[in-house]
Amino acid sequence: MKTYGVIKNAVSLDVVDFANAYLLLKRQVLQTFFKKRYINPFSHDWGTFNDAQVPNTYAIYGDIAMDTLLKGLKPVMEKKARELLSCTYSYARVYKKGDVLVRHKDRFSCEISC
């Protein structure tokens, strides 16, 4: 049986503010890169707007800042889970008004998520 838990205040407001500003700026950079045709529109190096779960919404896989946040949260998650964990990947999405993430089942590597 799976159990779920919430870890309140796992991330400080300063870190939340940084991550929010960082991802908003990264989204703007990608929009500029596409508009100016600096990068191939099929490249996902700077993120994507083509995530099937939430279309037309900025998302990024394996961003170094998000990987750093994940690494920092690892001890907190291990304490809550009461087991050693391996960080497999980071994924971030910037939701906008009207976006909906429908209930779904993540892949097995997401057994424990933060």
Name every feature range the model reports, one short phrase each.
Residues 1-81:
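Non-heme Fe(II)/2-oxoglutarate
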Residues 70-113:
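Conserved double-stranded beta-helix
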